[in-house]
């Protein structure tokens, strides 16, 4: 078992639905510790920078507009196999394909407004965590 850190973002649709606490409860019940957290309304530049890997994809502009449409809750999760565990909790990107009981099956509206973001690998997790948090903001 490997202790890992991963970045999680509760997106504007889920923040608007007031389900932050329910999502946090799922993280904690799965053995993930929240070791850093902040609520933020992303600027267009911040959203574009965070999702720069997708800049040439057809959905990029819509994704950026969605991510700046309201506040997001950004957190660092830590635990055994945190990346895979968080991705399992989130469910499939398309909520229609997500297993019952996953965050996206329960709280997402569409493939675009899909409630949460989670890092997909250790290198991207480290990069994404550094994008939003300094070392002094992480308590693990």
From Swiss-Prot:
One short Pfam name that applies is NDK
InterPro entries attached to this UniProt entry: NDK-like_dom (IPR034907), NDK-like_dom_sf (IPR036850), Nucleoside_diP_kinase (IPR001564), Nucleoside_diP_kinase_AS (IPR023005)
Q: What class of enzyme is it?
A: transferase
Its keywords, alphabetically, are: ATP-binding, Cytoplasm, Kinase, Magnesium, Metal-binding, Nucleotide metabolism, Nucleotide-binding, Phosphoprotein, Transferase
EC id: 2.7.4.6
Q: Name one GO cellular component term.
A: cytoplasm
Intracellular or extracellular location(s): Cytoplasm
UniProt binding sites for ATP: 11, 59, 87, 93, 104, 114
- Its primary localisation, in coarse terms, equals cytoplasm
Q: Give GO MF terms, alphabetically.
A: ATP binding; metal ion binding; nucleoside diphosphate kinase activity
The annotated active site, in chain numbering, is 117 (pros-phosphohistidine intermediate)
Entry superkingdom: Bacteria
Catalysed transformations (reactions): a 2'-deoxyribonucleoside 5'-diphosphate + ATP = a 2'-deoxyribonucleoside 5'-triphosphate + ADP; a ribonucleoside 5'-diphosphate + ATP = a ribonucleoside 5'-triphosphate + ADP
Question: Required cofactors, per record?
Answer: Mg(2+)
Q: Give GO BP annotations, semicolon-separated.
A: CTP biosynthetic process; GTP biosynthetic process; UTP biosynthetic process
Under the subunit heading, UniProt states:
Homotetramer.
The record's PANTHER family line, in alphabetical order, gives: NUCLEOSIDE DIPHOSPHATE KINASE (PTHR46161), NUCLEOSIDE DIPHOSPHATE KINASE DDB_G0292928-RELATED (PTHR46161:SF3)
Functional description taken from the UniProt entry: Major role in the synthesis of nucleoside triphosphates other than ATP. The ATP gamma phosphate is transferred to the NDP beta phosphate via a ping-pong mechanism, using a phosphorylated active-site intermediate.
Family note: Belongs to the NDK family.
| Full protein name | Nucleoside diphosphate kinase
Q: Which organism is it from?
A: Francisella tularensis subsp. holarctica (strain LVS)
Q: What is the lineage of its organism?
A: Bacteria, Pseudomonadati, Pseudomonadota, Gammaproteobacteria, Thiotrichales
